[in-house]
């Protein structure tokens, strides 16, 4: 059901054995039909602010791994990926076990990559994972080798110092600093009021960058102080 018909748009794939979209969006003008999986995946990754994966077949695996791969390699911006099971279900639990026992054990992914997704069978926990991701963090973009992380609230000086101490390895050179918007962001004037933290990013280990975002979201703000 998602956000309901009024606040949703659908990305349907034309298959010979599934002729219609789900009932909550079927027949709506905002339902987009695709002939190819790759264009459908491109659209949902580009437009999504979060993704929730439910138990499914090869198509579900394809889409989950596509989103994870694009985020892990920096080809898409980080956003919450929640793998939600029915209460007491084991679908994603055993999926994660496979990832751990094979991909991670063989060194094909890093332990930090596990920060890029959340496995749960609790709907409220899934909702919290998405909502809390945007508690202080707003968005980010790159200007040259600098990453500009936009914040809904400015951080305290102590919080910025703590980020520098804990996440120095993601910084290519210099330090993490808090500042106002850059001139290069003038194409996004609607968010120029937001505070930023800026640093030269190594552009690798995006699981660690996700951990930095998580740390930002539990940081002390300047207002709170």
Q: At which residue positions do the language-model features occur?
A:
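Metallocofactor- and cofactor-centric catalytic cores in central/energy metabolism, strongly enriched
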Residues: 1, 148-160, 173-225
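Active-site/ligand-binding-proximal alpha/beta "capping" segment
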Residues: 33-82
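Conserved thiamine diphosphate
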Residues: 42-53, 102-121
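Short, solvent-exposed amphipathic alpha-helical segments in soluble enzyme
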Residues: 2-3, 66-71, 98-101, 134-135, ...
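Glycine-rich phosphate/pyrophosphate-binding loop at beta-loop-alpha junctions
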Residues: 2-5, 12-20, 24-27, 69-73, ...
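PLP-dependent amino-acid enzyme catalytic core
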Residues: 119-143, 155-165, 172
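Short acidic-hydrophobic, aromatic-tinged amphipathic segments that line or gate anion-handling sites
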Residues: 30-39, 115-126
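Acidic/glycine-enriched connector segments
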Residues: 1-53
